């Protein structure tokens, strides 16, 4: 398909909205490169995948992830070393892969299309453990990453302590105030120095490492710590070398897993893409049409208009029995919008993007879509405008065939009306010969009359309210619309004398034509109103049908849960039975105790055994799994029982008759469901470090016990002391999987998002 046709139909704007929901630059790139498929099976496959994902979309929790494709290429190179930030980007994708795999694992059996994505979601436990064991969430390579690194860092700390100790002895001498500008130890050029008054710099033997901007202070490395600073420098270099070795080892692992990581990353992008489509569908209330022999687009709304307006009037666009549609009617009546709605809906459908139209809609597959649409409707159209339209049509007319959709706005405009009409009819005849699908709009009467006698084109018109001079944005089929030039002119104050003169120039035939159009338009409006009422009735029936289906599913689920609970109780009883047996046999001193115990338990077990079918009647009160119910119907060994507002067919051997039900007065009961309070956020602003850390540990313990997987800690920005204390405490907490700065929409750097090791995400 031509790029300019996609742009004319505003397909790029739909993709912009889709991309705004993406969690990764790679997903945005995928959306930007998206084009309609021209293979029917491919469209079906993509739609089935989207439908399957939409079924579980609310369970999927995605987070931001980077494009790691170039990093994986680099990791495969001999001797390559990835930086800490790059490795953490890959770890982030591993974590996302694990989360998506967890959600999909319980649905792939039920939703077959998800299996293709699920198979690409690998597990990376060895690599994940290596990264987590070597690098902390802040991007710091841990001491434990290697034995040599641990030894070197211990040496570094020992040397640093010795240097500080010696310098502290100097700056804390009583006479030091005479030559020091401040009693502190600082670092310049990677070496420990002290700030000396420039005027007294000669009193300290050592190396000068610079002066302050004011010149008042000179930073001096005393001679007695030079050898220690040298040793520290050597150790720092060894530390860097060890860190490089750690990163290189991790990079080699990543290179070994590059193929699987790439496939998992692509699966993450696919899931992100599907979630973008799901959120877009919710925004526009979209659905997927089915494939059909004809164009049947019901209650369609222009997708771009839906995004910027709330009160978009739906329209039905039908090409049934005939492959062509000629739409007429006044300006601002919605002709161009209807034309674009069909075109854009086709592009979206063949891209597997939900269309804002009724799910009952159907569309054929189009291999090509050609457009001739002017973005600006001008009162004065010149030859250059006409030439541009002709040039465009000359390009696509020869390429049109039976699988082509041609959309032409204002056919025949831009030149002499008589010649323009004749040329327009010629184009329509040519496209008919090509068996193309055609949707055109026009004002020209000869083309209107042509459509009424055509076996290929259906005439249609947009409806207009004469009283308010407002379009109704509805299409009436098998009728032609008047341009209403005289009526609109009169309403807006053109003198009646002018209107009468104009009508005389139209001629007797033209006047009869106008009156016929007015009468036909009134009839169509009445027809549309009746059709609207029927459509509302159909919707109500559909809604009731969906409600019945929902209740049926709820009943089946409740019944399934009931059996599951019964099975759970039985297992628990048997577990306790075994436990009691072990305790009795252990403690029993006499054979009598054992006999009594065995006799008692045998009696209990016999009570659990299946009973003979009971003779039950309608109205009997029975007991089932400790709950009372009422018999509504009996068929052989089966009884329909009402238990806790649920109707269930049960085996009569599972029921215990407890009496006859007494007639009860109808009682209305209002049930209020308590709202469970969720505590997934901790605010530490204003707390001192000690109190904050104590509350944080308690909060993490409670959140972990409550089953949360993600929680938030608000610490603010401030001096950064509280945030550092929070991060340090989190890094030591075994229940914390990892943590990160909140995204701007979550609170930014003043909030830390914490992922717990177990539990379920809120």
Curated annotation (Swiss-Prot):
Q: Which residues bind ATP?
A: 329-336
Q: What class of enzyme is it?
A: hydrolase
Sorted keywords for this record are: ATP-binding, DNA-binding, Endonuclease, Hydrolase, Nuclease, Nucleotide-binding, RNA-binding, rRNA-binding
EC numbers listed for it are 3.1.-.-, 3.6.4.-
**What GO MF terms are annotated?**
ATP binding; ATP hydrolysis activity; ATP-dependent DNA damage sensor activity; double-stranded DNA binding; endonuclease activity; mismatched DNA binding; ribosomal large subunit binding; rRNA binding
Any Pfam family: MutS_V
Keyword rRNA-binding among UniProt keywords: yes
Where in this chain does the record put each Smr domain? 682-757
Coiled-coil intervals in this record?
none
Q: Which SUPFAM superfamilies match?
A: DNA repair protein MutS, domain III, P-loop containing nucleoside triphosphate hydrolases, SMR domain-like
Q: Could you state one GO biological process linked to this protein? A: rescue of stalled ribosome
Q: Which InterPro entries match?
A: DNA_mismatch_repair_MutS_C, DNA_mismatch_repair_MutS_core, DNA_mismatch_repair_MutS_sf, MutS, MutS2, P-loop_NTPase, Smr_dom, Smr_dom_sf
Q: Does the keyword Membrane apply?
A: no
**In terms of domain of life, where is this protein from?**
Bacteria
* Reported function: Endonuclease that is involved in the suppression of homologous recombination and thus may have a key role in the control of bacterial genetic diversity. Acts as a ribosome collision sensor, splitting the ribosome into its 2 subunits. Detects stalled/collided 70S ribosomes which it binds and splits by an ATP-hydrolysis driven conformational change. Acts upstream of the ribosome quality control system (RQC), a ribosome-associated complex that mediates the extraction of incompletely synthesized nascent chains from stalled ribosomes and their subsequent degradation. Probably generates substrates for RQC.
Q: Which family does it belong to?
A: Belongs to the DNA mismatch repair MutS family. MutS2 subfamily.
Quaternary structure? Homodimer. Binds to stalled ribosomes, contacting rRNA.
This protein is called: Endonuclease MutS2
User: Which species is this UniProt entry from?
Assistant: Aquifex aeolicus (strain VF5)
């Amino acid at each position: 398909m031509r790029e300019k046709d996609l742009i004319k139909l505003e397909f790029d704007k739909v993709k912009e909205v889709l991309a705004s929901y993406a969690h990764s630059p790679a997903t945005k790139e995928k959306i930007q490169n998206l084009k309609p498929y021209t293979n029917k099976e491919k469209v079906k496959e993509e739609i089935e995948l989207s439908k399957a994902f939409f079924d579980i979309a609310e369970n999927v929790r995605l987070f931001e992830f980077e494009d790691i494709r170039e990093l994986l290429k680099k990791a495969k190179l001999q001797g390559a070393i990835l930086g800490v930030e790059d490795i953490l980007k890959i770890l982030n994708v591993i974590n996302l892969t694990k989360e998506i795999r967890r959600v999909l694992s319980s649905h792939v059996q039920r939703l077959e299309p998800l299996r293709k994505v699920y198979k690409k979601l690998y597990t990376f436990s060895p690599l994940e453990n290596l990264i987590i064991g070597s690098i902390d969430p802040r991007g710091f390579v841990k001491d434990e990453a290697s034995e040599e690194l641990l030894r070197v860092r211990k040496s570094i700390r020992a040397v640093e302590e010795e240097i500080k100790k010696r310098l502290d002895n100097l700056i804390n001498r009583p006479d030091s105030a005479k030559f020091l500008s401040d009693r502190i130890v600082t670092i310049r050029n990677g070496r420990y120095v002290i700030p000396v008054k420039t005027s007294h710099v000669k009193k300290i033997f050592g190396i000068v490492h610079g002066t302050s901007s004011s010149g008042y202070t000179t930073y001096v490395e005393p001679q007695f710590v030079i050898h220690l600073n040298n040793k520290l420098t050597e150790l720092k270099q060894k530390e860097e070398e060890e860190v490089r070795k750690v990163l290189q080892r991790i990079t080699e692992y990543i290179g070994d897993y590059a193929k699987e990581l790439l496939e998992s990353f692509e699966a993450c992008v696919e899931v992100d893409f599907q979630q973008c489509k799901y959120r877009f569908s919710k925004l526009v209330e979209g659905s997927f049409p089915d494939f059909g022999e004809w164009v049947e687009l019901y209650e369609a709304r222009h997708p771009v208009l839906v995004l910027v307006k709330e009160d978009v009037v739906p329209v039905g666009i039908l090409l049934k029995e005939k492959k062509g549609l000629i739409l007429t009617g006044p300006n601002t009546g919605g002709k161009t919008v209807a034309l674009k709605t069909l075109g854009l809906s086709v592009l979206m459908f063949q891209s597997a993007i939900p269309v804002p139209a009724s799910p009952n809609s159907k569309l054929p597959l189009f291999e090509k879509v050609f457009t001739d649409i002017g973005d600006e409707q001008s009162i004065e159209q010149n030859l250059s405008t006409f030439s541009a339209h002709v040039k465009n049509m000359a390009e696509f007319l020869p390429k049109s065939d039976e699988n082509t959709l041609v959309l032409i706005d204002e056919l025949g405009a831009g030149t002499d009306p008589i010649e323009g009409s004749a040329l327009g009819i010629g184009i329509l005849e040519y496209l008919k010969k090509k068996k193309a699908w055609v949707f055109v709009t026009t004002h020209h009467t000869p083309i209107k009359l042509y459509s009424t006698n055509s076996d290929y084109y259906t005439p249609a018109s947009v409806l207009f309210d004469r009283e308010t001079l407002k379009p109704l944005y509805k299409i009436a089929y098998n009728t032609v619309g008047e341009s209403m030039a005289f009526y609109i002119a009169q309403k807006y104050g053109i003198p009646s004398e002018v209107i009468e003169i104009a009508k005389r120039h139209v001629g007797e035939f033209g006047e009869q034509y106008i009156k016929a159009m007015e009468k036909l338009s009134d009839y169509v409006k009445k027809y549309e109103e009746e059709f609207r009422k029927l459509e509302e009735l159909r919707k109500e029936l559909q809604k009731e049908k969906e409600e019945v289906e929902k209740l049926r599913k709820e009943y089946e689920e409740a019944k399934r849960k009931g059996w599951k609970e019964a099975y759970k109780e039985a297992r628990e009883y048997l577990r306790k039975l075994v436990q009691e047996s072990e305790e009795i046999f252990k403690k029993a001193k006499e054979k009598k105790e054992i006999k009594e115990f065995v006799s008692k338990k045998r009696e209990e077990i016999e009570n659990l055994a299946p009973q003979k079918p009971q003779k039950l009647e309608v109205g009997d009160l029975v007991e089932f799994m400790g709950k009372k119910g009422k018999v509504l119907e009996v068929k052989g060994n089966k009884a329909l029982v009402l238990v806790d507002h649920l109707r269930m067919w049960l085996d009569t051997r599972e029921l215990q008759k407890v009496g006859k039900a007494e007639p009860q007065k109808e009682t209305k009961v209002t049930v209020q469901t308590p709202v469970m309070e969720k505590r997934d956020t901790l605010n530490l602003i204003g707390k001192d470090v000690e109190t904050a850390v104590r509350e944080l540990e308690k909060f993490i313990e409670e959140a972990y016990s409550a089953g949360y997987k993600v929680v938030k800690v608000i610490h603010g920005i401030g001096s950064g002391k509280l945030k550092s204390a929070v991060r340090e405490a989190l890094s030591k907490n075994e229940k914390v999987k990892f943590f990160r700065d909140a995204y701007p929409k979550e609170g930014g750097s003043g909030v830390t998002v914490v992922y717990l090791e177990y539990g379920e995400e809120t």
